[in-house]
Amino acid sequence: MIKILIPTAKEMKVCQNIARPKLSAQTQIIIDYFSTLTVSDLEDIYRINTSAARCEAQRWQDFKCKQLTLNPAIKLFNGLMYRNIKRHNLSISEAQFMENSVFITSALYGIIPAMTLISPHRLDFNTKIKINNNSLKVFWRENYDTFMQSDDIMVSLLSNEFETVFSPKERQKLIHLNFIEDRDGQLKTHSTISKKARGKCLTAMMENNCQTLEHLKQLRFDGFCYDNELSDSKQLTFVKKQT
């Protein structure tokens, strides 16, 4: 079975569903820390203006009181990759794939199934804070490494920021996907190409119930197809020819 790891995104699209969620002990530790910080503290940590810091301070207080706006994680995050993922009007098989095979790597919640209900927040692994005297990456490392203790194929659509949360040993188990555009023989890639292609690739995997690497290599999506010569056992490269 394939499991696909995707990152969170800064951009969010919030729906109004108020509830009192269950939170893990590690998530609660982070909430307890942030809920003690002042608006000024948050301005410095996030490097944002006072108005934005007030918004984040209120979010952390809402977390503390457990009066939260909850959304399925896959629908809450709304960055470029997410906007290229099919997230609405899923068939039964697509919804099952999303629930069982797609996981989001979060600095607040850990690794969670894509349909997990979560609340809007601002936190990533580059945030300069110490939780229990550890960086967020070290704080979550054991949890992330535990997720890798299975025989499933782990496909990474993560950036380096998220992959380095895993210990080097567990990181070696990840299968990376690379997306390149061929423009008149010139191979090019950049963040916009990669983010859009990650979303399109995940959609194709979901629509085709992709469960093996051989099946993944056969997929065609948004003009991309697998290139064996540019790939190896740990990195699958997909190329899109542009005229």
Curated annotation (Swiss-Prot):
Residues that span the membrane, as ranges: none
Listed Pfam families: H2O2_YaaD
InterPro entries (UniProt xref): YaaA (IPR005583)
Gene Ontology annotations of biological process type: response to hydroperoxide
Gene Ontology CC terms, in alphabetical order: cytosol
Similarity field: Belongs to the UPF0246 family.
Cited NCBIfam families: PRK02101.1-4 (NF002543)
Protein name: UPF0246 protein SAK_2020
Species classification: Bacteria, Bacillati, Bacillota, Bacilli, Lactobacillales
